[in-house]
């Protein structure tokens, strides 16, 4: 059970469809809170705190399935790797997407993060954009 100090108003439900196991996305820190889960199948989730403060760079990982939901606060980078084919990855957010939104990114495969992705970097399906994210040492912490 999740208890929040203040109400979280969900304004948008997003779904990302990934047809192949090994699709690897992230790590993106956004200026909104979100709940993430899957409608079907399994993903390996990874999060890195990119907020300014003592927890900057802290990493958490967990396997997610339709029975699991994770709350990701604004400023914590979110990433995932599909472990099954035909995954619908869902995320509820408390702010609408905007082209003016400020994001912070960190590289999925930065050794400093110590993320043990189940599917290797060589076998993972990664966008050029995600592969080009900076290493943690070059990330400017996000003000939230």
Model segments located where?
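Non-catalytic, conserved peripheral segments adjacent to functional cores
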Residues: 1-64, 84-86, 93-144
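Conserved metal-binding segment of the jelly-roll/cupin
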Residues: 63-85
